[in-house]
Amino acid sequence: MERGSKVKILRKESYWYQEIGTVAAIDKSGIKYPVLVRFEKVNYNNVNTNSFADTELINLGK
């Protein structure tokens, strides 16, 4: 997984569950949710990004 990769969200409580987003950044410092994902649509707070753990994502490639 790298910046620009398409990913599918597996976190059930997420607004974007089962949606496809694009990896915007990956933090290598050891935090719990290091992968920042950007989406086409916004959530109820008008936000289009969220952080996820590697285990909550399926990498679909570029």
Swiss-Prot record:
NCBIfam families: PRK02749.1
One cellular component term from this protein's GO annotations in UniProt: chloroplast thylakoid membrane
Taxonomic path: Eukaryota, Rhodophyta, Bangiophyceae, Bangiales, Bangiaceae
Keyword Magnesium belongs to the record: no
Gene3D superfamilies xrefs: 2.30.30.50
Name the UniProt record assigns to this protein: Photosystem I reaction center subunit IV
Record localization: Plastid, Chloroplast thylakoid membrane
Family of the protein in this entry: Belongs to the PsaE family.
Thylakoid is among the record's keywords: yes
Name of the gene encoding the protein in the UniProt record: psaE
InterPro entries to which the protein is assigned, alphabetical: Elect_transpt_acc-like_dom_sf, PSI_PsaE
Record's bilayer topology term: Peripheral membrane protein
Superkingdom to which the source organism belongs: Eukaryota
General function of this protein: Stabilizes the interaction between PsaC and the PSI core, assists the docking of the ferredoxin to PSI and interacts with ferredoxin-NADP oxidoreductase.
PANTHER family: PHOTOSYSTEM I REACTION CENTER SUBUNIT IV A, CHLOROPLASTIC-RELATED, PHOTOSYSTEM I SUBUNIT IV
Organism, as annotated: Pyropia yezoensis
GO biological process assignments: photosynthesis
Keyword annotations: Chloroplast, Membrane, Photosynthesis, Photosystem I, Plastid, Thylakoid
